[in-house]
Design a protein with these regions (language model features):
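Central hydrophobic cores of alpha-helical transmembrane segments
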Residues: 142-154
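Membrane-helix interface "capping/anchor" motifs
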Residues: 87-91, 133-145
Length: 286
Protein backbone atom coordinates (compact mmCIF):
# COMPACT_ATOMS: atom_id res chain seq x y z
CA UNK A 1 0.00 0.00 0.00
CA UNK A 2 2.89 2.35 0.75
CA UNK A 3 4.30 1.76 -2.73
CA UNK A 4 0.93 2.61 -4.27
CA UNK A 5 0.69 5.81 -2.22
CA UNK A 6 4.21 6.81 -3.25
CA UNK A 7 3.37 6.16 -6.89
CA UNK A 8 0.20 8.26 -6.63
CA UNK A 9 2.17 11.04 -4.93
CA UNK A 10 4.75 11.01 -7.72
CA UNK A 11 2.02 11.28 -10.35
CA UNK A 12 0.26 13.97 -8.33
CA UNK A 13 3.30 16.21 -7.88
CA UNK A 14 5.44 15.15 -10.87
CA UNK A 15 8.23 13.98 -8.59
CA UNK A 16 8.26 17.23 -6.58
CA UNK A 17 7.13 17.95 -3.05
CA UNK A 18 3.78 19.61 -2.38
CA UNK A 19 5.56 22.85 -1.42
CA UNK A 20 7.69 22.82 -4.58
CA UNK A 21 4.60 22.22 -6.69
CA UNK A 22 2.87 25.20 -5.10
CA UNK A 23 5.84 27.42 -5.97
CA UNK A 24 5.78 26.16 -9.57
CA UNK A 25 2.11 27.00 -10.24
CA UNK A 26 2.60 30.61 -11.50
CA UNK A 27 5.44 29.55 -13.80
CA UNK A 28 3.40 26.61 -15.09
CA UNK A 29 0.63 29.00 -16.10
CA UNK A 30 3.16 31.19 -17.92
CA UNK A 31 4.50 28.15 -19.79
CA UNK A 32 1.00 27.11 -20.86
CA UNK A 33 0.20 30.62 -22.07
CA UNK A 34 3.43 30.61 -24.07
CA UNK A 35 2.58 27.18 -25.48
CA UNK A 36 -0.98 28.05 -26.49
CA UNK A 37 0.37 31.12 -28.26
CA UNK A 38 1.92 28.92 -30.98
CA UNK A 39 0.04 25.61 -30.68
CA UNK A 40 -3.42 26.98 -31.52
CA UNK A 41 -2.41 28.88 -34.69
CA UNK A 42 -0.30 25.89 -35.78
CA UNK A 43 -3.25 23.51 -35.40
CA UNK A 44 -5.54 25.97 -37.15
CA UNK A 45 -3.11 26.33 -40.06
CA UNK A 46 -2.70 22.55 -40.36
CA UNK A 47 -6.46 21.99 -40.51
CA UNK A 48 -6.90 24.75 -43.07
CA UNK A 49 -4.21 23.10 -45.19
CA UNK A 50 -5.98 19.74 -44.92
CA UNK A 51 -9.25 21.41 -45.92
CA UNK A 52 -7.60 22.93 -48.99
CA UNK A 53 -6.16 19.55 -49.94
CA UNK A 54 -9.61 17.96 -49.55
CA UNK A 55 -10.94 20.34 -52.21
CA UNK A 56 -8.53 18.94 -54.80
CA UNK A 57 -10.17 16.23 -56.96
CA UNK A 58 -8.44 12.87 -56.60
CA UNK A 59 -6.72 13.77 -53.33
CA UNK A 60 -8.57 11.01 -51.47
CA UNK A 61 -9.70 13.50 -48.84
CA UNK A 62 -12.84 14.78 -50.55
CA UNK A 63 -15.17 13.14 -48.02
CA UNK A 64 -13.40 14.85 -45.11
CA UNK A 65 -14.05 18.46 -46.13
CA UNK A 66 -16.70 19.02 -43.47
CA UNK A 67 -14.53 17.40 -40.78
CA UNK A 68 -11.54 19.61 -41.50
CA UNK A 69 -13.68 22.73 -41.85
CA UNK A 70 -15.43 22.11 -38.51
CA UNK A 71 -12.25 21.55 -36.52
CA UNK A 72 -10.47 24.43 -38.26
CA UNK A 73 -13.31 26.73 -37.17
CA UNK A 74 -13.15 25.23 -33.67
CA UNK A 75 -9.40 25.94 -33.42
CA UNK A 76 -9.96 29.45 -34.75
CA UNK A 77 -12.56 30.07 -32.03
CA UNK A 78 -10.22 28.74 -29.34
CA UNK A 79 -7.41 30.91 -30.70
CA UNK A 80 -9.68 33.97 -30.64
CA UNK A 81 -10.80 33.22 -27.06
CA UNK A 82 -7.16 32.85 -26.07
CA UNK A 83 -6.23 36.23 -27.58
CA UNK A 84 -9.24 38.03 -26.13
CA UNK A 85 -9.50 36.46 -22.67
CA UNK A 86 -6.86 33.98 -21.55
CA UNK A 87 -3.85 36.15 -22.38
CA UNK A 88 -5.28 38.69 -19.95
CA UNK A 89 -6.22 36.03 -17.38
CA UNK A 90 -3.32 33.54 -17.41
CA UNK A 91 -4.39 32.15 -14.04
CA UNK A 92 -7.22 30.34 -15.87
CA UNK A 93 -5.20 29.04 -18.81
CA UNK A 94 -5.57 25.43 -17.62
CA UNK A 95 -9.19 25.59 -18.81
CA UNK A 96 -8.14 26.37 -22.37
CA UNK A 97 -5.39 23.75 -22.40
CA UNK A 98 -7.91 21.05 -21.56
CA UNK A 99 -10.44 22.39 -24.08
CA UNK A 100 -7.70 22.18 -26.71
CA UNK A 101 -6.80 18.63 -25.67
CA UNK A 102 -10.44 17.53 -25.80
CA UNK A 103 -10.79 19.08 -29.27
CA UNK A 104 -7.72 17.24 -30.52
CA UNK A 105 -8.94 13.97 -29.01
CA UNK A 106 -12.40 14.45 -30.56
CA UNK A 107 -10.75 14.84 -33.96
CA UNK A 108 -8.71 11.68 -33.37
CA UNK A 109 -11.73 9.68 -32.15
CA UNK A 110 -13.73 10.61 -35.24
CA UNK A 111 -10.84 9.60 -37.49
CA UNK A 112 -10.38 6.27 -35.70
CA UNK A 113 -14.03 5.25 -35.41
CA UNK A 114 -15.81 6.69 -38.45
CA UNK A 115 -13.23 6.66 -41.25
CA UNK A 116 -12.29 3.05 -40.42
CA UNK A 117 -8.85 2.80 -42.00
CA UNK A 118 -5.48 2.09 -40.46
CA UNK A 119 -4.02 5.51 -41.28
CA UNK A 120 -6.90 7.33 -39.57
CA UNK A 121 -6.63 5.04 -36.55
CA UNK A 122 -2.94 5.85 -36.31
CA UNK A 123 -3.81 9.54 -36.01
CA UNK A 124 -5.67 8.88 -32.78
CA UNK A 125 -2.84 6.74 -31.41
CA UNK A 126 -0.36 9.52 -32.16
CA UNK A 127 -2.63 12.09 -30.50
CA UNK A 128 -2.99 9.88 -27.43
CA UNK A 129 0.77 10.01 -26.89
CA UNK A 130 1.66 13.45 -28.26
CA UNK A 131 -1.12 15.80 -27.14
CA UNK A 132 -0.35 15.61 -23.37
CA UNK A 133 3.26 16.50 -24.16
CA UNK A 134 2.20 19.88 -25.59
CA UNK A 135 1.00 21.24 -22.24
CA UNK A 136 2.38 21.50 -18.72
CA UNK A 137 0.16 19.80 -16.15
CA UNK A 138 0.40 17.31 -13.30
CA UNK A 139 0.81 13.74 -14.64
CA UNK A 140 -2.09 12.30 -12.65
CA UNK A 141 -4.61 14.64 -14.29
CA UNK A 142 -3.22 13.91 -17.75
CA UNK A 143 -3.22 10.17 -17.05
CA UNK A 144 -6.85 10.24 -15.90
CA UNK A 145 -7.83 12.22 -19.01
CA UNK A 146 -5.99 9.73 -21.23
CA UNK A 147 -7.84 6.79 -19.66
CA UNK A 148 -11.22 8.53 -20.01
CA UNK A 149 -10.52 9.34 -23.67
CA UNK A 150 -9.55 5.71 -24.32
CA UNK A 151 -12.82 4.51 -22.76
CA UNK A 152 -14.77 6.99 -24.91
CA UNK A 153 -12.94 5.79 -28.02
CA UNK A 154 -13.73 2.13 -27.38
CA UNK A 155 -17.35 2.94 -26.56
CA UNK A 156 -17.85 4.94 -29.76
CA UNK A 157 -15.87 2.36 -31.73
CA UNK A 158 -18.34 -0.41 -30.92
CA UNK A 159 -21.43 1.82 -31.08
CA UNK A 160 -20.75 2.73 -34.72
CA UNK A 161 -20.70 -0.96 -35.65
CA UNK A 162 -17.08 -2.07 -35.44
CA UNK A 163 -16.30 -5.41 -33.84
CA UNK A 164 -13.49 -7.05 -31.94
CA UNK A 165 -12.54 -8.75 -35.18
CA UNK A 166 -10.85 -5.54 -36.27
CA UNK A 167 -8.38 -5.25 -33.43
CA UNK A 168 -6.03 -2.64 -34.90
CA UNK A 169 -7.65 0.29 -33.12
CA UNK A 170 -8.34 -1.62 -29.91
CA UNK A 171 -4.90 -3.12 -29.37
CA UNK A 172 -2.89 -0.17 -30.64
CA UNK A 173 -4.89 2.44 -28.77
CA UNK A 174 -4.55 0.49 -25.51
CA UNK A 175 -0.81 0.19 -26.06
CA UNK A 176 -0.55 3.89 -26.89
CA UNK A 177 -2.60 4.74 -23.81
CA UNK A 178 -0.03 3.02 -21.58
CA UNK A 179 2.82 4.55 -23.58
CA UNK A 180 1.21 7.98 -23.35
CA UNK A 181 0.83 7.76 -19.57
CA UNK A 182 4.45 6.66 -19.09
CA UNK A 183 5.88 9.23 -21.54
CA UNK A 184 3.62 11.90 -20.09
CA UNK A 185 4.92 11.27 -16.59
CA UNK A 186 8.56 11.35 -17.71
CA UNK A 187 8.14 14.52 -19.77
CA UNK A 188 6.04 16.34 -17.17
CA UNK A 189 8.48 15.41 -14.42
CA UNK A 190 11.31 16.87 -16.51
CA UNK A 191 9.30 20.03 -17.22
CA UNK A 192 8.40 20.56 -13.56
CA UNK A 193 11.97 19.85 -12.49
CA UNK A 194 13.24 22.48 -14.94
CA UNK A 195 10.66 24.99 -13.70
CA UNK A 196 11.64 24.33 -10.08
CA UNK A 197 15.33 24.82 -10.91
CA UNK A 198 14.55 28.07 -12.76
CA UNK A 199 12.66 29.34 -9.71
CA UNK A 200 15.54 28.43 -7.40
CA UNK A 201 18.08 30.19 -9.63
CA UNK A 202 15.85 33.25 -10.04
CA UNK A 203 15.23 33.43 -6.29
CA UNK A 204 18.93 33.21 -5.50
CA UNK A 205 19.70 35.85 -8.12
CA UNK A 206 16.94 38.29 -7.21
CA UNK A 207 16.81 37.89 -3.42
CA UNK A 208 19.26 39.17 -0.81
CA UNK A 209 20.01 36.14 1.35
CA UNK A 210 20.55 38.05 4.59
CA UNK A 211 17.43 40.19 4.64
CA UNK A 212 15.02 38.71 2.11
CA UNK A 213 14.89 42.02 0.22
CA UNK A 214 15.24 42.06 -3.55
CA UNK A 215 18.81 42.24 -4.80
CA UNK A 216 20.76 44.92 -6.65
CA UNK A 217 20.52 42.84 -9.85
CA UNK A 218 16.73 42.80 -9.54
CA UNK A 219 16.73 46.57 -8.91
CA UNK A 220 18.70 47.34 -12.06
CA UNK A 221 16.55 45.01 -14.16
CA UNK A 222 13.21 46.23 -12.78
CA UNK A 223 14.28 49.86 -13.19
CA UNK A 224 15.18 49.17 -16.82
CA UNK A 225 11.80 47.53 -17.47
CA UNK A 226 9.96 50.48 -15.95
CA UNK A 227 12.01 52.94 -17.99
CA UNK A 228 11.43 51.02 -21.23
CA UNK A 229 7.67 50.94 -20.58
CA UNK A 230 7.50 54.63 -19.68
CA UNK A 231 6.37 53.96 -16.11
CA UNK A 232 6.87 56.87 -13.71
CA UNK A 233 7.82 56.09 -10.13
CA UNK A 234 9.52 57.68 -7.15
CA UNK A 235 12.69 56.24 -5.64
CA UNK A 236 13.51 56.53 -1.94
CA UNK A 237 17.05 55.81 -0.79
CA UNK A 238 17.55 54.60 2.79
CA UNK A 239 21.01 54.45 4.34
CA UNK A 240 21.55 52.63 7.65
CA UNK A 241 23.62 54.83 9.96
CA UNK A 242 25.98 53.24 12.46
CA UNK A 243 26.59 49.97 10.63
CA UNK A 244 30.39 50.31 10.69
CA UNK A 245 30.33 51.25 14.37
CA UNK A 246 28.12 48.25 15.18
CA UNK A 247 30.46 45.94 13.27
CA UNK A 248 33.58 47.35 14.96
CA UNK A 249 32.11 47.45 18.46
CA UNK A 250 29.85 44.41 18.69
CA UNK A 251 30.95 42.24 15.75
CA UNK A 252 29.53 41.47 12.35
CA UNK A 253 26.65 39.44 13.77
CA UNK A 254 25.35 42.58 15.46
CA UNK A 255 25.79 44.49 12.19
CA UNK A 256 23.83 41.83 10.33
CA UNK A 257 21.04 42.06 12.88
CA UNK A 258 20.97 45.84 12.39
CA UNK A 259 20.59 45.38 8.61
CA UNK A 260 17.82 42.83 9.06
CA UNK A 261 16.05 45.12 11.53
CA UNK A 262 16.26 48.00 9.06
CA UNK A 263 14.69 45.85 6.33
CA UNK A 264 11.92 44.73 8.70
CA UNK A 265 11.08 48.35 9.50
CA UNK A 266 10.99 49.27 5.81
CA UNK A 267 8.92 46.18 5.02
CA UNK A 268 6.36 46.98 7.71
CA UNK A 269 6.19 50.68 6.85
CA UNK A 270 5.82 50.43 3.06
CA UNK A 271 2.93 47.95 3.06
CA UNK A 272 1.85 48.63 -0.51
CA UNK A 273 5.35 48.42 -2.01
CA UNK A 274 6.96 45.65 0.04
CA UNK A 275 7.85 43.77 -3.16
CA UNK A 276 9.80 46.81 -4.36
CA UNK A 277 12.29 47.06 -1.49
CA UNK A 278 15.83 46.43 -2.68
CA UNK A 279 19.14 46.12 -0.90
CA UNK A 280 21.63 47.69 -3.32
CA UNK A 281 24.64 47.93 -1.02
CA UNK A 282 25.98 46.92 2.36
CA UNK A 283 23.82 49.42 4.25
CA UNK A 284 21.74 50.91 1.43
CA UNK A 285 18.13 50.18 0.61
CA UNK A 286 15.85 51.50 -2.13
Amino acid sequence: MDKVNRLITKFKYAGLTAQEMKLCVPKVKEENVRGMRWILPLMFGSLVLLFIVSLIPGSGEETNKALYAFFAILMAVEWLIFKVYFQKHPEKIIILTHIFMLSAYAFGIYEATCLRDDASSTVFCVFLVAVPLLVVDVPIRLAMLTVVIEIILLTVYFIVGNSLGDQFVVINSLACMVLGIVCGYIVQRTKFSDIRNQIIIQTQRDTDVMTGARSRIAYVRDLGVMTDNGISAGVIFADVNGLKKANDTYGHEAGDQLIRKAYTLLYNHFNETKDCIYRIGGDEFV
